[in-house]
């Protein structure tokens, strides 16, 4: 049985197009027997903003404040959740040409030297290996493979840095460029999702 972690990151609630696609993917994969865990980073599972105190605490140490200990424990939970699943599905709507703050927060909690990556004499090495990632990205305009897409290249870089290099991408583009373009973008994305195996 494939174990899947789904990360939602939209802050738009019922208006979220990425949530529609993620729910479609979850339903499709559940019929294939996948065990799915959902973390709604833009909703009920929103994470604290990583500030200087938290960032310092995530490096560990003997003299951590109560808040730092709590945030380190949260980070450990998120990392364990990441490592426990075979496939990581990331909903990545484009907000102002990049990913939502809520998703960046998750990255800041799990990207830890000595835990999810390490530095060697030949450069960095990811420690989260043998995983697959699926990015589901929605955007109001058309940005795929262009200089204004700072979503997919960034996420591929981060995932590769921690060891996840098997990355598939589902695009839903031009969603704000009129009803016809919206329907076409969503239809093509749903079709792409239906071709994916859990």
Swiss-Prot record:
Cofactor: FMN
Domain of life: Bacteria
Keywords, in A-Z order: Flavoprotein, FMN, NAD, Oxidoreductase
Signal peptide feature range: none
Binding site for FMN: 10, 16-18, 94-97, 138-141
Catalyses which reaction(s): 2 a quinone + NADH + H(+) = 2 a 1,4-benzosemiquinone + NAD(+); N,N-dimethyl-1,4-phenylenediamine + anthranilate + 2 NAD(+) = 2-(4-dimethylaminophenyl)diazenylbenzoate + 2 NADH + 2 H(+)
EC code: 1.6.5.-, 1.7.1.17
Cofactor, free-text remark: Binds 1 FMN per subunit.
Pfam families named in the record: Flavodoxin_2
An example molecular function term from Gene Ontology annotations: oxidoreductase activity, acting on NAD(P)H, quinone or similar compound as acceptor
PANTHER family: FMN-DEPENDENT NADH-AZOREDUCTASE 1, FMN-DEPENDENT NADH:QUINONE OXIDOREDUCTASE
Subunit relationships: Homodimer.
UniProt similarity note: Belongs to the azoreductase type 1 family.
Purpose of the protein: Quinone reductase that provides resistance to thiol-specific stress caused by electrophilic quinones. Also exhibits azoreductase activity. Catalyzes the reductive cleavage of the azo bond in aromatic azo compounds to the corresponding amines.
Protein name according to UniProt: FMN-dependent NADH:quinone oxidoreductase
Origin species: Shewanella baltica (strain OS155 / ATCC BAA-1091)
Gene name, Swiss-Prot/TrEMBL: azoR
């Amino acid at each position: 049985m494939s174990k899947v972690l789904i990360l939602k990151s939209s802050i738009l609630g019922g208006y979220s197009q990425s949530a529609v696609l993620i729910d479609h993917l979850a339903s499709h994969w559940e019929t294939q027997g996948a065990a799915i865990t959902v973390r709604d980073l833009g909703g009920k599972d929103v994470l604290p903003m990583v500030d200087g105190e938290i960032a310092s605490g995530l490096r560990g140490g003997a003299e951590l404040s109560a808040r730092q200990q709590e945030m380190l424990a949260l980070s450990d939970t998120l990392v364990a959740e990441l490592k426990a699943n075979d496939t990581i599905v990331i909903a990545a709507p484009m907000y102002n040409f990049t990913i939502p703050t809520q998703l960046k927060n998750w990255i800041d909690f799990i990207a830890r030297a000595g835990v999810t990556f390490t530095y060697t004499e030949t450069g960095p090495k990811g420690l989260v290996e043998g995983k697959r990632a699926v990015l589901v990205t929605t955007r109001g305009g058309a940005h795929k493979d262009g200089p204004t897409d700072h979503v997919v290249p960034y996420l591929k870089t981060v995932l590769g840095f921690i060891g996840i290099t098997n990355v598939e991408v589902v695009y839903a583009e031009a969603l704000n460029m009129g009803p016809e373009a919206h329907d076409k973008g969503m239809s093509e994305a749903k079709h792409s999702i239906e071709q994916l195996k859990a």
